[in-house]
């Protein structure tokens, strides 16, 4: 709910010429949390036990709630009075559930059921004047649809990198989990630094240009990841992670800016929710692709020294697929057109 509404509120509050900067700061804050979360969680777990993680998270939640109640005085219910689409919401939730579970478990019946529900959902939503998901918007707004596709491809190509590199650093390089975590933090740290800058730039340059450049940098980093082996220096791994973080930062804020700037004010909530949906589905697809590659190449086995070579080969295949997805994402990003006259 937070991810689905935060960008909509920011877009409603800030004028178009400052929208990218605001979204960039928000994105940078998200990535800062991603950087500090694993480190803070590790410190808390090691010193105070795993329950302390949930206690501290609850405290942060209450603090955020207090800040929102005190300082967020306005209201942005631009679609107030419209009927809520309960039927469409139920179909939508069921569709995502079956698709994500089907791809995660490689269950053909669940995948087919998810696809059938997707077709029903599109047909049903296309008939409504007040749908939960603006299918007509996707079909009629090229900038919105291609920007959403670019986001989906970017998340699908990058989310599982942290998972693969965590295993690589622990199994192949022999680091403990805490050290591997410190190394992996280099990616979101770079993202936190450059996301606000990219958002600011997208207020002055067409977002599609900035986002496409970011997609290109991300593609390059994934190609470099596809070249790793057991002898790759850790310094190279850190450099690849930082390059990936820079590419994602350069893409994310401008792409979100393009999505939010391509729709009318009354669709801000739907557009923001679409960004969150693309993130969720893309991340799920990313992990599903990794699991599929490993399942087809080595099956369900424990990663022991005798399988280290196969693990590296599977990882390289996965990175190659991710690079291809990101490469196609460049064209989706470039094809969206201008958002400014």
In which residue ranges do the predicted regions lie?
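Membrane-interfacial helix-loop-helix junctions in multi-pass membrane proteins
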Residues: 102-106, 308-315
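Residue-level hotspots within transmembrane alpha-helices of multi-pass secondary transporters
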Residues: 5, 35, 39, 66, ...
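12-transmembrane solute porter fold
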Residues: 29, 48, 110, 130-300, ...
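Hydrophobic transmembrane-helix bundles of small-molecule transporters
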Residues: 46-150, 157, 183
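Helix-loop-helix hairpins in multi-pass membrane proteins, especially solute transporters
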Residues: 1-87, 265
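Transmembrane alpha-helical segments of integral membrane proteins
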Residues: 68-71, 299-304
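A residue-level signal for alpha-helical anchor/packing sites in multi-pass solute transporters
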Residues: 9, 13, 43, 71, ...
């Amino acid at each position: 709910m937070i991810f689905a509404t935060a960008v909509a509120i920011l877009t409603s509050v800030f004028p178009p010429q400052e929208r990218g900067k605001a979204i960039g700061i928000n994105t940078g804050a998200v990535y800062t949390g991603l950087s500090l979360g694993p480190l803070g969680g590790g410190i808390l777990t090691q010193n105070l036990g795993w329950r302390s993680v949930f206690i501290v998270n609850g405290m942060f939640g209450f603090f955020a709630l207090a800040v929102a109640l005190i300082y967020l005085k306005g209201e942005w219910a631009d679609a107030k009075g419209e009927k809520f689409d309960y039927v469409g919401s139920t179909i939508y939730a069921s569709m995502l559930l079956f698709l994500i579970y089907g791809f995660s478990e490689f269950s053909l019946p669940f995948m087919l059921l998810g696809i059938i529900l997707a077709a029903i959902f599109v047909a049903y939503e296309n008939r409504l004047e007040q749908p939960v998901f603006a299918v007509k918007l996707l079909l009629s707004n090229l900038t919105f649809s291609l920007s959403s596709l670019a986001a989906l491809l970017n998340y699908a190509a990058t989310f599982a990198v942290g998972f693969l590199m965590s295993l690589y650093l622990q199994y192949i390089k022999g680091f403990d989990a805490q050290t591997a975590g410190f190394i992996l933090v280099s990616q979101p740290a770079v993202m936190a630094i450059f996301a606000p800058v990219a958002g600011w730039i997208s207020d002055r340059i067409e977002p599609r240009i900035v986002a496409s450049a970011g997609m290109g940098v991300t593609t390059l980093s994934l190609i470099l990841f596809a070249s790793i082996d057991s002898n790759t220096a850790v310094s190279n791994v850190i450099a690849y992670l930082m390059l990936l973080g820079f590419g994602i930062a350069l893409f994310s804020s401008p792409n979100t800016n393009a999505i939010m700037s391509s729709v009318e004010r009354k669709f801000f909530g739907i557009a923001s929710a679409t960004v969150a949906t693309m993130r969720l589905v893309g991340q799920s697809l990313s992990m599903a692709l990794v699991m599929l590659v490993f399942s087809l190449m080595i099956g369900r086995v424990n990663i022991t020294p005798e399988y280290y070579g196969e693990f590296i080969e599977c990882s390289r295949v996965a990175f190659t697929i991710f690079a291809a997805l990101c490469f196609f994402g460049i064209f989706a990003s470039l094809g969206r057109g201008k958002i400014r006259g």
